[in-house]
Amino acid sequence: MALTQVHNKFKIFTGALAADKTIGPLAEQISAFVAERKVAAKSIGVEYLESAKKLIITLGYSEGGDTYPVKVSTVSLGKIGGLETGDVSRLEEAMTGACASIQGIICHELYITDDGDFLVVFMSRA
């Protein structure tokens, strides 16, 4: 199945964090782009630029194949802490719990705000 994720096109979305620290309206912009352009969404990348207080989200996609609607969701994991020791089990558990209510996950990306909140972005089939 990994071959179905192959892509060579990218679209960049940028904006401020929403008040709740999620990607806010950028989620709908991504879904709308996929629907309007009739592309197959394959991957997302998320980077939070603390100094600029801006998000940069990259959408990897392909053209000319099967298309499908997508939904982009952000789930707050809160402050995880304790990662200095290298034990990431709490983060893994939080991410696993966060995806329990989301069906058809295509990919995910984790970001951390400047005040230490962990959030995960899921792209799933709508």
Where are these regions (language model features)?
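Terminus-proximal functional modules
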Residues: M1-A126
